[in-house]
Design a protein with these regions (language model features):
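Hydrophobic transmembrane architecture of multi-pass small-molecule transporters
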Residues: 11, 413-514, 519-528
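Short, Lys/Arg-rich, polar N-terminal cytosolic tail immediately upstream
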Residues: 1-13
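Small-residue-rich alpha-helical segments with characteristic i,i+4
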Residues: 156-159, 294, 370-454
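C-terminal membrane-cytosol helix-exit motif in multi-pass small-molecule transporters
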Residues: 181-199, 218-229, 247-261, 506-513
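Helix-loop-helix hairpins in multi-pass membrane proteins, especially solute transporters
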Residues: 74-216, 229, 238
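Short helix-capping/hinge motifs at transmembrane helix termini and TM-loop junctions
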Residues: 106, 138, 194-198, 231-232, ...
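Central mid-sequence intracellular linker of multi-pass
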Residues: 181-223, 234-235, 240, 267-273, ...
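Transmembrane core module of solute transporters
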Residues: 16-80, 99, 109-111, 127, ...
């Protein structure tokens, strides 16, 4: 093709142009990421508005996440075939259209269909901006890329519940989709006009290995389905989950076989030949586990134990976002001066410390009690994300960088999916254990326990003269208190286990080989 004879060097673009391109793409990424959390915070209102059942409404999120997970690794291939410009513009445009369609959904089936389209198109924007940023910038400027994109990645799940709750209460649930229209249209127009960093290779579309594509779709879609629906359906006790798991396992085998033997693979696994990239992906898996799980657990605690509404929850968790913003600059500065292995080790240790502090919650914890642990967690996560991105993507060039970016981002999403599924299971199991222990403790409490129950019964009897009704009220009050305290202890158990997981991840740091520091003296000519 004539286009191929005149390749574009993204690194040679004028600096203002590079920053404009990066800003447009980063905003598109933020729009796609925050949408997940905005909708998650408003699912109850969407369910009521569409008259959907509990099992049906879960597919509004599951469908989106399944489609997004499939697109993330596929984006590298499409970026080469269509060019970064047209892939990003098409993704932003279709994401905007599907958002509008979600807002106009007339029943749960139409909503699920439009959410799948929204997830598929949104998934292309996330890895594309990482690869483009690393291709355009070098030196100290490149060091800012993982910091800024890391901040975007963690701010979205932090701010999403606040924005979603406010929009739903102030305007209505359909507004959470309509809000994407204006910024989405703007990103689409800007993408068409400014993102000119490479040229399309349309001939690649003729080389698509459809069996490889199908295997990847079944593998990632099936895995997301099992992880999302498993906790609700008692995992493999449910026939549907068991069948999906077997199908996913078969798809994994076919995916690996086609990745290694196909002449036109959709996803290239060659980046894993570099041990540092493989370990950085494992870091990202753990980071995704901790980031999304902790962001999921704190609002659940505040809602179920403290009885907070959406606005109160948002006000409490926003502390984490503020700490993330403040730590972004520090993380970026460290990336040019400190070995990435040291920085990520500090980040993992601080994150583990924050989780350990959170594991001492009582049922009375609110904004002030959570302030310190949340601020520390927000500060620490940036010290985890920035060096892990540097370790993963710092040693790749050109096309391979796209595949590495897709695989790396996929790991964080998988970590989040695995994390939420696992902590849901841990939470339910541990809560039941603590309820049983409370029952045993009450039975063994002796006179002091009997006196306490007698005092409670007397207070209830004063308000409820009918003896039978008073007994029912007392049983309900006792069950509520026991359930609340058992759930609080279960939350603490989960945070404690997560803290140990982050400390265990430290063993991988010595096996990584960091790229040269961006702020270091220029390397000798033969350094590469």
């Amino acid at each position: 093709m004539s286009d191929a004879a005149k390749p574009i060097d993204p690194g040679a673009l004028p600096t203002p142009t590079k920053f404009l391109i990066f800003a447009v793409m980063a905003f598109g990424q933020f729009m796609a990421l925050i949408d997940i959390q905005i909708v998650a915070a408003s699912l109850n209102s969407v369910q009521a508005g569409l008259s959907a059942g509990p099992d049906e409404i879960s597919w509004v999120q599951t469908g989106y996440l399944m489609a997004e997970l499939v697109m993330i690794p596929f984006a590298a291939f499409l970026a080469q075939a269509l060019s970064t410009r047209w892939l990003f513009a098409l993704s932003a445009g279709l994401f905007t259209i599907s958002s509008a369609l979600c807002g106009m959904a007339w029943d749960i089936n139409s909503m699920i269909l439009f959410r799948v389209l929204q997830g598929f198109t949104g998934g292309a924007m996330v890895p594309t901006v990482f690869a483009t940023g690393f291709a355009m910038f070098s030196g100290p400027q490149r060091a800012m890329i993982p910091a800024i994109l890391g901040m975007v990645s963690v701010l979205a799940p932090t701010l999403g519940p606040t924005v979603g709750g406010w929009l739903t209460e102030a305007i209505g649930w359909r507004s959470i989709f309509y809000i994407n229209i204006v910024p989405g249209a703007l990103v689409t127009l800007l993408a068409i006009n400014v993102i000119k960093v490479d040229r399309p290779k349309l001939s690649m579309l003729k080389t698509i290995d459809y069996s490889h594509l199908a295997a990847m779709a079944v593998l990632l879609g099936g895995l997301e389905y099992v992880l999302e629906e498993g906790p609700r359906r008692q995992w493999f006790e449910d026939d549907g989950i068991a069948i999906a798991a077997w199908v996913t396992l078969v798809a994994l085998g076919l995916f690996i076989e086609r990745s290694l033997r196909s002449g036109g693979p959709i996803v290239k696994l060659s980046p894993f030949r570099k041990p540092t990239f493989a370990f950085a992906c494992l870091f990202n898996l753990v980071i995704g586990f901790g980031l999304y799980s902790s962001t999921y657990l704190i609002p659940i605690f505040l809602g179920r134990v403290r009885g907070y509404d959406s606005l109160e929850i948002g006000t409490t968790v926003v502390v984490t976002g503020i700490a993330q913003i403040l730590s972004t600059v520090i993380a970026a500065r460290l990336s040019t001066r400190v070995d990435a292995r040291i920085t990520v080790s500090i980040g993992l240790t601080l994150f583990a410390a924050a989780l350990w502090l959170t594991s001492h919650m009582t049922s009375e914890w609110g904004f002030m009690a959570l302030l310190g642990p949340q601020a520390l967690r927000g500060f620490a996560i940036m010290l985890c994300i920035v060096p892990s991105v540097t370790l993963a993507l710092g040693g790749f060039e050109a096309a391979e960088l796209r595949y590495a970016s897709g695989l790396f981002n996929l790991m964080r999403n998988l970590g989040g999916a695995i994390g939420i599924a696992v902590v849901n299971t841990w939470l339910g199991d541990n809560a039941r254990i603590h309820v049983a222990r409370f029952g045993e403790a009450l039975g063994e409490a002796g006179r002091s326990g009997t006196d306490a129950l007698g005092t409670l019964a007397a207070r209830i009897a004063e308000r409820t003269p009918d003896a039978a009704q008073a007994a029912l009220v007392m049983q309900g009050e006792l069950a509520r208190v026991v359930g609340r305290e058992a759930l609080t202890l279960a939350f603490n158990d989960v945070f404690r286990i997560m803290a140990v997981l982050f400390l265990a991840a430290l063993v991988m740091a010595p096996f990584c080989k960091p790229p040269p520091l961006a702020g270091a003296a220029p390397p000798p000519p033969d350094a590469h």
